[in-house]
Amino acid sequence: MATKVLPLVELKPLLGPRQRLIGIDLGTKTIGLSLSDVERRIATPLETIRRTKFTKDAERLLALADQFDVAAFVIGLPLNMDGSAGPRVQATEAFVRSLSGLTSRPFCYWDERLSTAAVTRDLIAQDASRAKRAAVVDKLAAAFILQGALDRLAWVHETADKDLP
C-alpha cells in the first residue's frame, strides 16, 4: 500500500459527513493524540501513547481510529525554525510510511513548529505543576496541531463558497 500523504486542502472531498480526524504529535518517547468533533471544528486532547514498539503503537492508534470513525490523520511536521527539514522530519516521514502500510486512511502534514512550546507556556500560565505538564503536554500539543488544521480547513471551505477577486 502506497503512502497517501495529501495537502490539507485535498482532504476535504474525501471526508464523510460526520467522520473525524486524529491529530498526532509524534515524539521519541510518546505520541500525543487528539480528536476532532464530528463537525471538524474543535480539537480535543485524546490520549498519550507511551512508545514501546511500532507494532503496539500502531495497533493502539488504529484501534482509536476505528473506534471514532476517523477519516484521516493530521500529523505534526517538526520543521526547523528556518523551515528546513531535519532528522525529526525524517523520523516523522518514516513513521507515516510504516503506518500507511497498515491503513488506507490518508495523512496530512501540519507545521508543528513551537506547538509544544505554546502549550507549555499556557500550562505554566495556568500554574500547572511540572508533573501535570508532563502528563498532558503531548496530547495538548496534538490538539494544538489538529486545531490549526481544522481552522485552515474551515477557512478553505468558507472562501470556496465566496466569490473572491
Curated annotation (Swiss-Prot):
Enzyme class: hydrolase
Function comment: Could be a nuclease involved in processing of the 5'-end of pre-16S rRNA.
SUPFAM superfamilies cross-referenced by the UniProt entry: Ribonuclease H-like
The organism's place on the tree of life at top rank: Bacteria
Family membership noted in the UniProt record: Belongs to the YqgF nuclease family.
CDD domains in alphabetical order: YqgF (cd16964)
EC number, UniProt record: 3.1.-.-
Protein name: Putative pre-16S rRNA nuclease
Keywords: Cytoplasm, Hydrolase, Nuclease, Ribosome biogenesis
GO molecular function: nuclease activity
GO cellular component assignments: cytosol
Compartments (UniProt record): Cytoplasm
Classification via SMART domains: YqgFc
A biological process term (GO) from this entry: rRNA 5'-end processing
